[in-house]
Design a protein with these regions (language model features):
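RNase H-like polynucleotidyl transferase catalytic core
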Residues: 137-139, 143-160, 179-181
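Active-site beta-loop-alpha junctions of metal-dependent nucleic acid enzymes
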Residues: 85-110, 134
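RNase H-like two-metal-ion nuclease catalytic core shared by retroviral integrases
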Residues: 116-117, 128-129, 149-171
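Active-site-proximal acidic segments at structured loop/helix or strand boundaries
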Residues: 167-208
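Acidic/histidine-rich, metal-coordinating catalytic segments
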Residues: 110-130
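Mobile-element integrase/transposase regions
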Residues: 12-24, 28-83, 91-98, 143
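Short, charged amphipathic recognition helices of the HTH superfamily
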Residues: 2-14
Length: 208
């Protein structure tokens, strides 16, 4: 069987080999390694119609001869493996709210929960370590449509991993080879047509 060395034994071995290192440093390193080893991400599974994930992603497009950075509001369903996006000139509140309205109108219904990171459009300010004050206009939107808001922990992208992966998939699938359009409207139409192809094998019909 594998032998386990104690902190004292490791410290003695290193000192004997000529390393100038304190016992406390050894202990701290062992604790740090053990903590990392315990961290694991469990893949979540959801029922149809239960959860959406939301994120913004940037894409560079040549519109009417001018190169610029545009913003994709990306909404995805982990259960249905469905991905959708809308192009905007910015990530302001108007674009954020508009993307929800467009998506719910398109699918003809509302999911029980939508998950977000701590973006400004969602979280107005932090109160203490765990409390968050949500944007008032966004709260009104969620009440109107009747969905629950789930905000991830800070720096925990894995909590909405499906949409983060969807941003990359849509960007590469749709705009890797074609990024020049006469207008943003034309880019939007092209995005829509490519998303229909991308979602051919999704389970969106089962979710409705």
């Amino acid at each position: 069987h594998k032998q386990s060395l104690t902190g004292q034994q490791i410290h003695k071995m290193l000192v004997d080999q000529g390393f100038d290192i304190s016992y406390c440093t050894i202990i701290n390193k062992i604790r740090e390694k053990n903590k990392k080893a315990k961290e694991c991400f469990i893949k979540q599974s959801y029922n149809y119609g239960e959860r959406l994930e939301y994120d913004f992603g940037e894409v560079k497009l040549l519109i009417n001869g001018s190169l610029g950075t545009y913003h994709m509001a990306v909404i995805s369903s982990p259960a249905g493996d469905f991905r959708w996006a809308y192009l905007y000139r910015n990530q302001k509140k108007e674009a954020f709210l508009d993307s929800h309205v467009k998506f719910f109108e398109m699918v003809g219904g509302v999911y029980k929960e939508v998950t977000y990171d701590n973006m400004k459009n969602v979280v107005t300010k932090f109160i203490g370590k765990n409390q968050k004050e949500l944007n008032e206009d966004f709260l009104k939107l969620s009440i109107y449509y009747g969905f629950n808001i789930n905000v991830t922990n800070c720096f925990s992208g894995n909590e909405k991993g499906h949409v983060e992966g969807s941003v990359k998939i849509i960007r590469s699938y749709v705009f890797a080879n074609k990024y020049e359009f006469p207008s943003l409207e034309h880019a939007q139409i092209y995005l829509h047509s490519q998303l229909l192809k991308l979602n051919e094998n999704s389970k969106m019909d089962e979710e409705k």
